[in-house]
Regions:
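Canonical tetratricopeptide repeat
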Residues: 69, 108, 144, 178-181, ...
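TPR/TPR-like (Sel1-like) alpha-helical repeat modules
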Residues: 92, 150, 155-173, 183, ...
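Alpha-helical segment of the N-proximal tetratricopeptide repeat
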Residues: 29-55, 59
């Protein structure tokens, strides 16, 4: 009797061992795959990283940071719908993360909605970005907010954001790229001002000048808002750009623990 019991226990242990070993081996392999995905991600090989992340996301409960990484990968693949979906899901769980890292996720979510022309959804994420991003990046964010409000025909808000952007860009006005952006802002702000005063003549906006270059504001030709919007819309198919490097938000010691 005792011999039969020992035999049954031995068989049971063997069955359990045979069952657990493949699971442990698979989990170890998947941890290696996650490490590989992080390497691809840090090297800006977003397509390769996304393929691995997608597989692991179907198998494991990836944490919010990894879901945010997936959102960034989708963004760089021009899949703005999935980028926004993953980032919106992940962002509420990232409150304890470093401020600038969070600003990257907010900005990417905003850009995803912007590129889908869902400007009302983009605005709050741009506004959250402003409170956390570097000073050097704030001009770009205000410029984007100006675009959102202009496309939504909220002329005063658009004008105000363009003025904020102009003020912030003045610190870097010697840079050639910034000079072009400043000239563009002057034209768009003037057009928004004209549109606003056409519908609210009793509330004239006081134009503030920051002397981008001597006489710019006096000689700039006003373009119709429809022409400006048409021109801007045609440029929205350009390759997406995020103003910080991915390596700034990913740690080389990123944990690769997986949970079922």
């Amino acid at each position: 009797m005792a011999g039969n019991i020992r035999k049954e226990i031995a068989i049971l242990l063997l069955l359990l061992l045979n069952t657990c070993m493949p699971v442990a081996a698979q989990k170890s392999k998947d941890a290696e795959e996650l490490g590989k995905a992080l390497e691809y991600f840090a090297s800006a090989k977003y397509h390769e990283a996304l393929l691995i992340f997608q597989h692991l996301d179907r198998t494991y409960r990836l944490n919010d940071r990894f879901k945010a990484y997936i959102g960034l990968c989708y963004y760089h693949e021009w899949d703005y719908d999935n980028a926004a979906r993953y980032l919106e899901e992940a962002i509420p769980g990232l409150d304890t993360f470093a401020p600038h890292e969070r600003s990257v996720y907010y900005y990417t979510a905003a850009e995803s909605f912007f590129n889908m022309r869902r400007y009302g959804k983009a605005v709050p994420y741009y506004e959250m970005t402003l409170s956390l991003c570097y000073e050097r990046e704030k001009g770009d964010v205000c410029y984007r907010l100006g675009l959102c409000f202009m496309f939504m025909q909220e002329w005063k808000k658009a004008y105000d954001q363009y003025m904020n952007a102009e003020r912030l860009y003045q610190q870097y006005k010697k840079e050639k790229e910034v000079q072009g952006r400043l000239a563009q802002i002057v034209r768009m702000a003037a057009a928004c001002r004209t549109e606003y005063e056409a519908v609210s003549p009793q509330d004239s906006l006081q134009k503030k000048t920051y002397n981008t270059t001597e006489g710019d504001n006096a000689t700039t030709q006003l373009k119709s808002i429809s022409t400006i919007i048409k021109s801007l819309t045609s440029t929205m198919l350009s390759k997406p750009v995020i103003p910080v490097l991915v390596k700034d938000i990913i740690s080389k010691k990123e944990k690769t623990n997986l949970q079922k």
